[in-house]
Amino acid sequence: MELSFKNILVVGLGLIGGSILKTIKELNIPLEVYGLDLDEEVTKKANNIGLINNIDNQLRKIEEDCLIVFSVPSLSIERAFELIEDSFNDEKVIFTDTFSSKSKLLEFLESNTKVGEKFVMSHPIAGSEKSGLANYNSLLFKDKLVVLSAVNGDKDNKKLNKVKNFWELLGSKVTIL
């Protein structure tokens, strides 16, 4: 199984976001890896430990195909999107998330329909009682269920399959609603 994008940007570098990045690195998945956190010191720490290529929250524009994963608290989706909105090519991006609660995300997507057209909702059933980047775990998603749903309800769309392949490469079992 191979990925159809060359870059990944994880926005939110806590337990889940950090674990995504650590898994990519340990499995040697061939991606250019970027990360941002609402706390720029966390972004710098992720760079210092070798999880991401960028050194701070100032990204160059990613021109090639990119998966952007929002792994911030769901109430912070608007702020997180503002942080990255100039960092990607609109024609070559797919968005997904790791939120368990989708209500704030759906509100955001209703008022940002262009983003919604490129969004696949993800809910990894994985976690820990611990939080923060310091607790990342490359096995967090192994054999764990990830539930996917296209914003438009189309189960056969290409974006959905690309996100499904991504989670499967991380070791997850994927189901589509």
Predicted regions and their residues:
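Internal alpha-helical scaffold of NAD(P)-dependent oxidoreductase catalytic cores
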Residues: 141-177
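NAD(P)+-binding Rossmann beta1-loop-alpha1 motif at the extreme N-terminus of oxidoreductases
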Residues: 1-59
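Conserved short alpha-helix immediately C-terminal to the canonical SAM/SAH-binding motif I
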Residues: 41-42, 76, 102-105
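Short beta->alpha hinge that forms the Motif I/post-I loop of the SAM-binding pocket
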Residues: 38, 72, 98
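General small-molecule cofactor/ligand-binding pocket signal
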Residues: 34, 56, 120, 175-177
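Rossmann-like NAD(P)-binding element
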Residues: 60-94
